[in-house]
Regions:
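Phosphate-handling substructures
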Residues: 67-125
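Glycine-rich phosphate-binding loop signature in dinucleotide/nucleotide-binding domains
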Residues: 42-45, 133-142
Length: 181
């Protein structure tokens, strides 16, 4: 069984800033969300947790699994997509001239520029991670948890459910919510 969770809230989430690989910590609400998720999902018998090395995801996993004997294993391939020089940009949804606008509004026409990562690069690294780490565990009937980020999580969900790129954002997971894939 595979479960996926998005990290708790950060100040940049609340300010509608692109986080990407910028290492932003959870804010007080994000900490509370992760603690509440720990209670809500305490009955799920996770065997292992893979997590992005970024602080907001690591802290979410630590709070979620506090007091449980579940290994938390960071993997660089679970980092959020890089938005390059556009990280920190506010309200990209209101700026069609910004190259990152299509990332959210029209994924099939998104072109990575200025140090940003492409969808192809994102799918390549998360696909490799799935094949190398997750699929063998699922074949052994293990219960696997991934704690990550919006786009990174969606790339895994899209791959496993066969969702085309134009529908990439239909599976968005709210902060600290858990889905079963």
């Amino acid at each position: 069984m595979l479960y996926i969770m998005r990290h708790g809230k950060t100040d940049w989430n609340e300010q509608y800033r692109l986080q990407g690989r910028t290492d932003i910590p959870l804010n007080e609400e994000g900490i509370r969300m992760a603690q509440e998720a720990a209670v809500k999902y305490k009955e799920i018998p996770f065997d292992i947790c893979f997590v992005s090395p970024l602080l907001r995801a690591r802290k979410t996993a630590e709070l979620l699994l506090a007091g449980r004997k579940v290994d938390i294993v960071p993997d660089d391939r679970l980092q959020e997509i890089s938005f390059g020089k556009y990280e920190g940009t506010r309200n990209v949804f209101q700026h069609p001239e910004c190259p990152i606008y299509n990332f959210f509004q029209d994924p099939t026409h998104y072109r990575a520029v200025d140090g940003a990562e492409s969808y192809e690069e994102l799918f390549a690294r998360t696909g490799e991670f799935l094949q190398e780490k997750v699929m063998p565990l699922l074949a052994e009937d293990k219960t696997v948890l991934i704690v990550g980020h919006g786009a990174m999580n969606n790339s895994i969900i899209s791959r496993l459910r066969g969702i085309p790129l134009e529908r990439f954002w239909e599976t968005a997971i709210p902060n600290c919510e858990l889905i079963q894939v």
